[in-house]
Curated annotation (Swiss-Prot):
Protein name (database record): Golgin subfamily A member 6-like protein 6
Upper taxonomic lineage: Eukaryota, Metazoa, Chordata, Craniata, Vertebrata
Compositional bias ranges of the Basic residues kind: 15-29
Metal-binding keyword on record: no
Coiled coil: 164-686
Biased segments, Polar residues type: 61-71, 79-91
Organism of origin: Homo sapiens (Human)
Compositional bias annotation for Basic and acidic residues: 39-60, 94-108
Positions of the UniProt region annotated as Disordered: 1-108, 314-342, 374-454, 517-548, 561-724
Length: 724
């Protein structure tokens, strides 16, 4: 007779049942077959426990977390068989609880997978954003480098333009000095011309006075000549009368007296003729002097015209220089506006870079937070694994006492877990080696980059030294050129001083000539006085010879008539000379007016030159201010370059960090892909297990039906035995 266990036996206190395991929805109970109150629970629980043990034996190494969870569920499912409601002799949970536990485990795994996939997507999005930010930052850095190069080239061009402006200013200054010297020469020549004009005016006045005196003398001579002619006629008449009236003695006496008078008259006429000849010579000399003065005046007029042309050319050159300076100022203003716009663009780009840096910092903080969360999740997983291992150890100790089969299965599981751990350790060691190799490579790359940076810095220092040397050479060449210009200017000054000395010597020579002429005039006056004395003596002698020269009177009268004609001609010539003198005076006045106009023009030019000097001084001040601005801009550019270098270093550090993060993310993605593959394999296995469980349940139902049939038969047999 079979003995069935009693339903009122207590369960084991150390083996609690799992309260959270739900029933499987795909395994409905059979509604038509009635279950035995004592046999159905035992058979079902024992068969389900054996099927789950077989499943854990088949797939224990797919996922360690799944395996631990399955072992935990197994440990929790094991029972002493003391619970009358759930167990009969095997001590297993109900299939509904196991199905609930498996569903909860699958849902938890799916949630973890979804969370990990979500984190992976977030990390990939952040990685793409970081890559885009890096690309834009690199593009901005390249643009800034190109703009910095453009600014440096423009600075060099501005420096060259400033040098050209300095050269132009120096040329203008030299031209101004030349113009000043030329103006000084013109003033000196003007003074010399004014002196000559003053002297010419004085000589003209003297000549006019002398001409007036000569005209008065000529009038006196003509009057005397007419009186002498009248006297001669009267004397002739008297002689004729005397010849008729007086005797011979009286006639001889009167003839002697008349001869003396004729001799005196002839002497006077000869003296007058000689004086006229002297005055004619003096007039000829004066005419020659006037012609020479006219030639000199023409030469001076030509020189003045040439000077006026030169002054016009200088004015045109000055106007061209002013136009060039205006154009250069406009170019400088345009360049300053461009520099201001570029500075504004640089400020805007710096603000954009700062914003990008802030975005990068925020993204880095987010990535750090994600990494911290990942580390926390890893720590939680490790803690859960440790707890699961501890629970496994405790449950394994309890199960060793209960079932030998479970020990064998657990030993197999442990061996498999040890293999997995060894594989994981090997993988970790390989990963550590790979990380160490990558770190070594990164350190080598960093060292190479540092060496490259050092070499680039050395090359830049050498380039700066070369540039400084070139600037020194250029400055030395400029100094040499300036010294050569100074030497040339000194030579020109010396030449001008020599010219001035020569002009002074010429002036001294002219003054000496004038003095000699004055001495000649004085000697001539003395000669005139001596001639007068001689004339008086001659007159006395001529009075004695008058009687002898009666015959010569007629000849002298003829000569006198000729001399009168000559005197008339001389008077006509004098009139012509006076007209010429008037014309020369008019020309001199016109020249004086022209000289005054030239002086006014020279004054205007001097005023213009002063204005140009003021403009050049203002331009020099502006150039100094511009040079100060350029120095400030260079300092700003250097500061910007330093900030750019710092930003580049920061960007490189960020790139390194991002690369490390990308490597970590790739590793995590690989791990996640492996986990996903494992999860897909686990899901496939779970689906296969569910199919097997359904098949086993169908088998169990068939077995239960057979058991029910056997029970019915046994009951019939028992009834028969009781009846017997």
């Amino acid at each position: 007779m079979l003995m069935w266990p009693q339903p009122h036996l207590p369960t084991h206190p150390h083996l609690p049942t799992h309260p959270h395991l739900p029933t499987h929805p795909h395994l409905p109970t059979h509604p038509h077959l009635p279950t035995h109150p004592m046999m159905s629970k035992e058979t079902r629980q024992s068969k389900l426990a054996e099927a789950k043990e077989q499943l854990t034996d088949h797939h224990p190494q797919t996922n360690p977390s799944v395996g631990t969870a399955a072992s935990d569920t197994k440990k929790k499912k094991i029972n002493n068989g003391t619970n009358p409601e759930t167990t009969t002799s095997g001590g297993c949970h109900s299939p509904e609880d196991e199905q609930k536990a498996s569903h909860q485990h699958q849902e938890a795994l799916r949630r973890e997978l979804e969370a990990q996939v979500h984190t992976i997507r977030i990390l990939t999005c952040q990685k793409t954003e970081l890559q885009m930010a890096l690309y834009y930052s690199q593009h901005a850095v390249k643009q800034l480098e190109g703009e910095a190069r453009d600014l440096i080239s423009r600075l060099h061009d501005s420096w060259k333009f400033a040098g050209e402006l300095e050269q132009a200013l120096s040329a203008v200054a030299t031209q101004k000095k030349k113009a000043d010297r030329y103006i000084e020469e013109l003033t000196k020549e003007r003074d010399a011309l004014s002196l000559e004009l003053y002297r010419n005016t004085i000589t003209d006045e003297e000549l006019k006075e002398k001409n007036a005196e000569l005209q008065e003398k000529l009038q006196l001579v003509e009057s005397e000549k007419s009186e002498i002619q009248l006297n001669v006629k009267e004397l002739k008449r008297k002689l004729e009368r005397a010849k008729l009236l007086l005797p011979q003695q009286q006639l001889q006496a009167e003839a002697d007296h008349l001869g003396k008078e004729l001799q005196s008259v002839s002497a006077k006429l000869q003296a007058q003729v000689e004086e006229n000849e002297l005055w004619n010579r003096l007039n000829q000399q004066q005419e020659e002097k006037m012609w020479r003065q006219e030639e000199k005046i023409q030469e001076w007029e030509e020189k003045i015209q040439e000077q006026e042309e030169k002054i016009r050319e200088q004015e045109e050159k000055i106007r061209e220089q002013e136009e060039k300076m205006r154009r250069q100022e406009e170019m400088m203003w345009e360049k300053e506006e461009k520099m201001r716009r570029q500075e504004e663009m640089m400020w805007e780009k710096e603000e954009k870079m700062r914003r990008q840096e802030e975005m990068m910092w925020e993204k880095e903080e987010k990535i750090r937070e994600l990494e911290e969360k990942m580390h926390e999740q890893e720590k939680i997983r490790e803690q859960e694994e440790k707890r699961q291992e501890e629970e496994k150890i405790r449950e394994q100790e309890k199960r060793q006492e209960q079932e030998a089969k479970m020990w064998r299965q657990e030993e197999k599981i442990r061996e498999q877990e040890e293999k997995i751990r060894e594989q994981e350790k090997k993988m970790w060691r390989q990963e550590e080696k790979i990380h160490e190799q990558e770190k070594i490579r990164e350190e080598e790359k960093r060292q190479e980059q540092e060496e490259m940076w050092r070499q680039e810095e050395k090359i830049r220092e050498q380039e700066e030294i070369w540039r400084q040397k070139e600037k020194m050479h250029e400055q030395e060449e400029k100094i040499r050129k300036q010294e050569e210009k100074v030497w040339r200017q000194e030579e020109k000054i010396r030449e001008q001083e020599e010219k001035i000395r020569e002009q002074e010597e010429k002036m001294w020579r002219q003054e000496e000539k004038i003095r000699e002429q004055e001495e000649m005039w004085r000697e001539e006056e003395k000669m005139h006085e001596q001639e007068k004395i001689w004339e008086e003596e001659k007159r006395q002698e001529q009075e004695d010879k008058m009687w002898r020269q009666e015959e010569k009177i007629r000849e002298q009268e003829e000569k006198v008539w000729r001399q009168e004609e000559k005197i008339r001609e001389q008077e006509e010539k004098r009139q012509e000379q006076e007209e010429k003198m008037w014309k020369q005076e008019e020309k001199i006045r016109e020249q004086e007016e022209k000289i005054r106009e030239q002086e006014e023009k020279i004054r205007e030019q001097e005023e213009k030159i002063r204005e140009q000097e003021e403009m050049t001084q203002e331009q020099e001040e502006k150039m100094g201010e511009q040079e100060e601005k350029m120095c400030e801009q260079e300092e700003k550019m250097q500061e910007q370059e330093e900030t750019m270098w710092r930003q580049e270093e920061k960007i490189r550090e960020q790139e390194k960090k991002i690369r490390e993060q990308e490597e970590k993310i790739r590793e995590q993605e690989e791990m996640m892909q492996e986990q996903e593959e494992k999860m897909w394999e686990q899901e496939e296995k779970m689906c296969e297990q569910e199919e097997k469980m359904q098949e086993q349940e169908e088998k169990m139902r068939r077995q239960e039906e057979k058991m029910w049939e056997q029970e019915v038969r046994l009951r019939q047999q028992e009834e028969k035995m009781q009846e017997h």
